[in-house]
Regions:
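Extracellular/virion structural assembly segments
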Residues: 1-207
Length: 207
């Protein structure tokens, strides 16, 4: 479920800080010739630390109830980071084609003329049917084949099946609470709630 914010709920506050952390468990093994062997110990995931200003009662109630409801029903907490909302790419992504069998750290999008504009390096990217959020590391347009190739970090969490479409806007991080504990109610003498924070980690479905 979507984390309440000013875009979706008039009573919801915006956060004052959003610390996005790259967690990429890698094992490094130095070889006799001096080279370093890198082995992925587990899948990469993003974690997110959200901090909020002092909250009025209704603001606190909206946020805490949403968190408790997500825990109750076993749902993810979906977070939009407004600094990545740029709409550099528009058009009709449903008319593009992502062929089946793609894996690794890049993706090729066919029928690219259905899209207008181009993403910047560092923009977020998703594909339909996948929960993982990626960052764009490179962009190559091939006019002859009417395709674009995006370099992605991290690598694709699962192999494409040919039904996916690209997502460049309104990208949601599908997160869960790190310890499934709701934030503490810290009410001061002025009736304001202090120190509301959320520590979340990405919930990646790689099946």
């Amino acid at each position: 479920m979507r984390l309440p914010d000013p875009f979706t709920n008039a009573d919801a506050p915006g956060f004052t800080g959003a610390r996005l952390v790259d967690n990429n468990p890698v094992i490094y093994d130095e070889m006799p010739n001096g080279s370093v062997l890198r082995v992925d110990g587990a899948a990469q995931f993003w974690s997110l630390e959200l901090t909020y200003p002092e909250l009025f009662y209704m603001e606190f109630a909206v946020l805490s109830a949403a968190v408790m409801e997500a825990i109750r029903v076993g749902d993810t907490i979906d977070v939009l980071l407004p600094q990545y909302e740029n709409y550099r790419v528009t058009g009709n992504p449903n008319s593009t084609v992502i062929t089946a069998g793609q894996k690794g750290n890049q993706i090729v999008i066919q029928n690219a003329s259905a899209l207008n504009g181009r993403p910047n390096i560092g923009d977020l990217f998703k594909i339909t049917g996948h929960s993982k959020v990626y960052k764009i590391t490179s962009y190559t347009l091939n006019n002859a084949s009417n395709s674009i190739t995006l370099g992605l970090y991290p690598k694709l969490a699962k192999i494409t099946d040919g039904t996916e479409k690209p997502i460049f806007n309104n990208i949601l991080f599908e997160m869960v609470l790190v310890d499934d504990t709701i934030p503490t109610e810290d009410l001061d003498v002025n009736g304001m709630y202090q120190g509301f924070e959320l520590t979340l980690r990405e919930n990646v479905h790689a099946e």
